[in-house]
């Protein structure tokens, strides 16, 4: 069984995330959407909200499982018997950052990182941008799924 973990804070879930997830579904038997938790990090949305965003968006997709985890992503992958870490790349900066992490993860665990390029109309979307636009009262609706818009 080909199983991948797509880790993130999903604060909030964006159409950039769903673009990567939806395009990865045919590649894997199961994709675990893994919300990493860090008690020293401030989040805009509660863990419960972020779980709801993911579960509601993928409630009809049998290949998707939603979990939370603490600690190293590779340790979580091992606990789930996942052989791959799925990551999205928006630009060259993402590539350099993710390449370094991916190589380190592989050295530590033998777990490969699989990178998908963002679709051309989604490369500008990030949770950071969405949070900033929301904070300043701007229109963010074109960057997030319906479940986030309703929150």
Curated annotation (Swiss-Prot):
The UniProt subunit note reads as follows: Homohexamer.
**Matching Pfam families:** CTP_transf_like (PF01467)
Question: Its Enzyme Commission number?
Answer: 2.7.7.3
Class of this enzyme: transferase
Q: Which SUPFAM superfamilies match?
A: Nucleotidylyl transferase
Which positions make up the signal peptide? none
Cite a single GO MF annotation: ATP binding
Q: Which InterPro entries match?
A: Cyt_trans-like (IPR004821), PPAT (IPR001980), Rossmann-like_a/b/a_fold (IPR014729)
Q: Does the UniProt entry include the keyword Transferase?
A: yes
Q: By what name is this protein known?
A: Phosphopantetheine adenylyltransferase
User: Which gene specifies this protein's sequence?
Assistant: coaD
Q: Which domain of life is it from?
A: Bacteria
GO cellular component terms given for this protein: cytoplasm
Q: Which cofactor does it need?
A: Mg(2+)
Q: Which reaction does it catalyse?
A: (R)-4'-phosphopantetheine + ATP + H(+) = 3'-dephospho-CoA + diphosphate
Q: Where does ATP bind?
A: 9-10, 17, 88-90, 98, 122-128
